[in-house]
Amino acid sequence: MNPSRLRAAAIALGLSLCGLGAVQAADLRLRLMQTSDVHMNLLDYDYYRDRPTAEFGLARTITRIQQARDEVPNSLLFDNGDLIQGNPLGDQVARAPAREGAVHPAIRVLNLLRVDAANIGNHEFNYGLPFLRRTLAGASFPYLNANVLSADGRAPAFTPTALLEREMRDEAGQIHRLRVGVLGLTPPQILQWDRQQLQGQVQVRDMVETARDWVPRLRRAGADVVVVIAHTGLEKHELPRLSENMAVQLARVPGIDALLLGHAHAELPGPGFEGYPAVDARQGRIHGVPAVMPGRWGDHLGLVDLRLRREQGRWRVVESQSSLRAIFDRARQQPLVDADPMPAVVIAREHEATLAHIRRATANTDTPIHSYFAQVSDSLAVRLVAGAQLAYARRAVQGTALETLPLLSAAAPFKTGGRQGWTQYTDIPAGPIAIKHVADLYVYANTIKVLKLRGAEVRDWLEMSAGQFRRADPRGPAEQPLLDPDFPGFNFDMLYGAPGELSYELDLTQPARFDREGRRISDGQRVQALRWRGQPLDDAAEFLVVTNSYRAAGGGHFPHLGADRLVIDAPDETREALAAFLAEGGVAPWAQAAPGWRLRPVPGLSLQLRTGAGALAHDAAAAGLRLVRELGDGSALFALEADR
């Protein structure tokens, strides 16, 4: 080759190498999209109120998904569990006879959405393992979980991880083969919450230990990016192994590039996590790891936008931003997007069957039944559940050695607004009670359990419930909020005997005795004047307490509760017992009974409750409250009357 041609070839080779270097140096942007805790709200329809809604529903989230996909060249879509249970549609599908080869309606929707991978949440286990396995079999994408093990503990019970290989376009327009490793995790507490369904069939492992094991395996398998889909939330303090909300601890596991979170129905990024150690509530990072949690019921789409750079032969995350895209403007009470029509077409048959079922009347009430004030006063909505449990348990103990023991019933309000939204309250008008109203009163697929406890342990049960309230400070501001917003309404148990048998008061100037994890933090005595049949409750006496499967198995971290206290392990759902109780005329006796408990007002203080504006249609004075003002965002402020 002559010198001029040699020089030309060298120049061409140099330019080619320069070009190759430019390709390798170009950054690649990857968008991770997440839904979580949809709870069968596939449509923008509220089955409890039996009408369309703009506040939640995957049908509207899908519009956000399509918009977010169209904005970027590279994206992946994930679901983080608690998909198949949570409303009457989910129950209707689970009740229907299994048809060979039929695909669950929620899975049909996710298949059409082109979901890349999904995680198994804790509520996926509510209907039992056979139903769950049939459901997952219909998915055209990998369904993951790594910390639920086989009965002998030797192997994962489900597919633990996935290595997704996708062609991605970098910012220079070049195509790269990117391998995204995905790991699924769920709370170990499934063995408590669904003990009846899972005992002897699976074991569980700590989520953090599982991640430490599997993340390096994904790296060794060639993962360029590792995404952990963890059905777990965040706590401010350090937690022991096998805890429920381990996001902060998971973020410390080396090798994780992004955390997709759920379970807590909270919103990250967002002001609710300001002040949490190691959490950047604005950028959406935990210990520097990009993270997102998209609320519940499809009210937000979660996004994690990653910028990847090729360095030393591997892709590294050099920049991230997490964000949420709402479907509804809560402040203005306006929808932000329209519903995508696809889910309504895909699940039309199941939707119509659900409507036919929930509209069937079973009983009647002369009194409105609502939960707007249920966290601060004795509520008929809660009393009816307690009464149904008592009636069931009386029949269960009849003719046994347990029949002579005094019987109590624990029940809590499930629909209490707040994070759920200011329309999310039980609100049943006087008149016919339909199946939808029964489901509104009791929204979970729990079963009935009976525990045996001493009187002192019953007192601690109430002290734990009283942790719902902030401490009232007589020397503090004249206006003080009543509720701790981090305390779930479904953990505010009220205890009842038959009408008139049990009574007590709560003194909120006392410190809480237990924290939310059930740890004793003081000798506070918020529970006052605790009486059984007119006499002070005997701390040494034995009681039977009827409750639900979640609480009996330790859900909510109540002291003294657990499987070792179980004396009746009933298989029947609380909702079934409630429907039968209402049909037998159970409303009137409890509607006419005197309140069993009350809050002691604090002279000089206005203790305030924020609740849904629907409360304006009900008698606040009967609950010992007065209206302060309507807040204009679907909520209203009430104050505890000091002279009641």
Q: Where in the sequence are the language-model features?
A:
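Acidic, metal/ion-coordinating pockets
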Residues: 24-326, 384-388, 397-400, 407, ...
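Bacterial N-terminal signal peptides that target proteins for export
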Residues: 2-10
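Polar alpha-helical coiled-coil and adjacent low-complexity
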Residues: 6, 19-23
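Catalytic centers of hydrolytic enzymes
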Residues: 26-31, 35, 41-67, 174, ...
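Bacterial N-terminal signal peptides
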Residues: 10-19
